[in-house]
Structure formats: structure tokens, C-alpha cells
Amino acid sequence: HMRSVEMFDQNFGKIIHMLKETGHYDDTLIMFTTDHGVPYPFAKCTLFDSGIHVALIMRDPKPIVKGVHIKGLVSQIDVAPTICDLLGIEKDDGYQGKSFAKVFSNLHEEMDEAVFAEINFHTSYEPARCVRTKDYKLICYYGDYEKINRSNIDNSPTKQYYMEHGMLDKEKCMLALYDLANDPLEQHNVIQEKEYQEVYQMMKQKLETWRKETGDMALPLTEDKWEKAWQVNQPACIDPKSKREEDFIQ
């Protein structure tokens, strides 16, 4: 991980140097982000923060606010409308995201009250959705495979270690509520605890409303509906790069 950070720093530095050398540094909007968390178990291709919390670094050439770390909630669907506002471009009516361009001039500008994320499949079918607020997260799985979906985890020594220490038998929480203020690592599912039932209902309503507003639906589960071009593993497949015919939905 630290080597990846070092490589990013070195190569991003080359881009900054080139912009300065060509005289475009002070008229260029600069942004760096990533698509998901690290490719380890319980990170990439999960809805834990370790999977959906990604880097986002932006520089507006003429900001009032600069060089600060902002802790508000932002979704990547907010990036396109933000770029439009910063560059003075008319936004498309179909954008679902909310521009956070005003943050560059006002640190106290309101950010997203909640953000949403989803999984359908990486190499195998695993429909899941989540809603995250500042203090809570609700994760819902909509499939019927209750074990950890190993084929959606990239192969690595870390994955091998987890498989040798019980991950093959471990079941995931199909419905989970996390108190992020007190449990930032999402280790304790409080969905059954009495004092969290009001929070659960609130988060459930937010997620259901979002799904209705966006026309969200899980991908078809029946095997005859898969596109022929898709490579779709069986849920119990361990290796995402398996070449065994029985590991695939034909």
C-alpha cells in the first residue's frame, strides 16, 4: 500500500511539474481519485468504508479555501456537477449528484447528508446496497448466498491467509447497521439492538427512497438472463480467474 502511495506521489508530481513548465498550472483544475478500496478481503467489492472510502484530491486554480482536509460526505456522482460549476459549464439535467463547488470558497458549505453505494457483481453475482450518513451505515444484501463471496475478492497472500483461517466457513451479515461514531471499523452489527431500532427505520427509509428515486433494481438472478459476453462465476467459486467450467454460470 505504501509503495502504491509513493508511486502515485512521484507520478502525480511529474504531471504538476509539466503543468508548471508549460504555463498551465494556474489555469488547470486538478483532480485525483480512485475507484475502490484496497483489493483485500473486506475491502474492495464490499460496502464497508474500506471498500467505498476512496481518495479525492482537488485543486481549483483560484480558490479562496485551499490546502485543507474536508471531512464531509461526498459521492463520486457529485464530481461531474462540481466540475461543471467550477468551469462554468451548464450541468446536464440527468446528473443525480450534488455539486460541492461552493466548498472551495466556503468551508461551512453543506455537503451530502447521506451517500449511497452498491454492488452487483465483480466476477460473481452479489447484489447489495448501502446508505451512509455521518454517524451510521446500513448495508443490505439482496441475494441468497450467505457466505463470504470469495470470487469477488482478488487473489493475494492476504486472501490466502484469511481462507486458511476460517473465511471459507464465515457468513456475512445480510442486513447490518453500524454505529460509525462508536464503531468506525464496522465490527459490531447493532441491527438487533433495541436502542438502534429508530435509527434502523430512518436508514431503511433513506435507502428505500433512494432506490425508488433512481429506479434501482437488482440484476436478474436467473441463469438464462445473463449476457453471453459476461463472465459470471458461481457464488461458491473461490478463484476469480478460475478456468474450471463448473465455476461459471453458463
Feature locations, PLM:
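Active-site rim elements
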Residues: 1-5, 63-73, 86-91, 117-118, ...
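Structured segments of extracytoplasmic/periplasmic soluble domains
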Residues: 18, 22, 85-86, 103, ...
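A long, amphipathic alpha-helix that forms part
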Residues: 1-28, 63, 86
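Long, internal low-complexity/basic segments
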Residues: 53, 166-175, 180-185, 190-250
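Short, solvent-exposed turn/loop segments enriched in Gly/Ser/Thr/Pro and often Arg
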Residues: 32-40, 44-46, 96, 119, ...
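C-terminal cap/loop subdomain of S1 sulfatases and analogous C-terminal strand-loop tails that border
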Residues: 38-40, 80, 87-176, 214, ...
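Histidine-centered active-site microenvironments of extracellular/periplasmic hydrolases
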Residues: 18-75, 96, 235-243
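A structural signal for well-ordered alpha-helical segments within the folded catalytic domains
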Residues: 6-13, 74-81, 95-98, 133, ...
